[in-house]
Amino acid sequence: MSYKLSIVKNKMMKRIINILILLCCIASLSSCGNSTEERSRVLKIYNWADYIDEDVLAEFPDWYKQQTGEDIRLVYQVFDINEIMLTKIERGHEDFDVVCPSGYIIERMLKKDLLLPIDRNFGRTPDYIPNVSPYIRHELNKTSQPERQTEDYAVPYMWGTAGILFNKKFITPEEASTWNILWTPKNRSKILMKDSYRDAYGTAIIYAHARELADSTVTVEQLMNDNSPQAIALAEKYLKEMKPNIAGWEADFGKEMMTKNKAWINFTWSGDAVWAIEEADAVGVELDYTVPREGSNIWYDGWVIPRYARNVKAASYFIN
């Protein structure tokens, strides 16, 4: 009996080994097929989640072929934190062809020589880039570096504000009209903060200098760009004082918690606030958004081509 069992086991083992070998061969052939695809036929996009019409992505390959006569396949990935995107490019040398960072990250990338100029030689295709709002272009150009204008390396895409999204059942518009709301004991464990180092810092430093802002002796822009040890220590102090009120640091789940009444307040971006208000309205929850009277950060996101991109041509057409 044991002899027969041994034969059966041996046959089963051989069959398993043969299956594994076959699977390895298939995987090998598959990877070979992928490796033979020319990189010039692939466009790697790295963008914020829910930040572009899916029809644009679906229609781009056909449009690109009409313009250039070349096939293109999109590889689309999303991120939710600027610094994660930057780390992948700066340290990991990821070969994304086009990404959409915020203005302050664009400035860092310019300083660190991590951007390529946008190729605006579109042949018979019209150049739409000059249609960008002059105001937004001007604001973005404030991040220019010596001998490098930001507008040669970035095209503005979206802009907005950072402010307070609040549940009107628990928070009044008057309460939400000042940054004091984030430090009010009433809101213990009821506040969601956007997982953004710059915006968290900005909120604390603006709150700390509310009197100076009211007297117009300092501007929000000056405060946001002050990274002195004294300013950092002051922001840290106020963020620690806010800690008991914080229910969590969110990148994308704020909308869900607000619509389910699990949080009353969400420090967030205006674009996310619009989505949250619409979703909450559908389930009978009334949310509103405001920028506190002390002032706030205005953000700009723009399309850029990272240094390690391998398809500058398609990236430039996509941006255009």
Question: What positions do the PLM features span?
Answer:
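C-terminal motif of bacterial Sec signal peptides marking the signal peptidase cleavage site
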Residues: S28-S31
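Early extracytoplasmic/lumenal segment of secretory-pathway proteins
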Residues: S35-K112
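Hinge/lid segment of periplasmic solute-binding proteins
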Residues: L86, E107-W159, P173-N180
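Alpha-to-beta junction loops
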Residues: R91-C100, L114-L115, N187-S189, K260-T268
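Short helix-loop capping/hinge motifs at secondary-structure junctions, enriched
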Residues: F170-S177, H209-T217, A309-A315
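Short loop->beta-strand "edge-of-pocket" segments that line small-molecule binding or catalytic clefts
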Residues: I181-D199
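Ligand-binding pocket segment of bilobal, Venus flytrap-like solute-binding proteins
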Residues: L192-M193, A200, A204, E212-D288
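Extracytoplasmic/periplasmic substrate-recognition and gating elements
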Residues: D272, E279-N320
